[in-house]
Amino acid sequence: MSKTSNSNWETTVKPIVVLSVISLVDSLLLALVNSMTAPVIAENTKRTTLAAYVGVLPSVSDATELEEVTGYTTANVTGVVKAPDGSLAIKAEESGFDGGIVTVIVGMDANGTETGIWVDASTQTKGIGSAVAEDDFLKQFDGLDCTQNVVMGENGVDGKTGATFSSKALFAAINDCVNCYNELA
């Protein structure tokens, strides 16, 4: 009888206990690593965002010149800053291919003309969806009137061939920025 009981322990219960302990230890280690790296990741994200804001606003040379804007209600807009000359940089995020986020920052002067655009499509398929962030593709938006929504295939702006979901996400995020600009204007 004890042999059957011992056999049941060895074949059924022991593996479950061992795997549970291993899973618990792994979870604790992952939580520890996450708590140590989360502040570093947040700081790097903030630094990247501030650099992108400065990059899309030609009148600004340093992020300390920017003033954070609040009070907007436009969906998917995650940040707005204002330069001393009244130009704005607006950040929006939309879902691209496979749910990956496409982040867009559009700079607009006080008249609503696009002054720069920055795109992070690193979550999109490399070489296909990520191509919506390439400078050659983004040049088509130079000087665009950002007081009206941008329609893919109209006014000289086209989507990226082979990157339908990423292109739609890019245009949706740009239009989120346009809508926010109009809300704040």
Placement of each model-derived feature along the sequence:
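Flexible, solvent-exposed loop/hinge segments and secondary-structure transition points
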Residues: 2-185
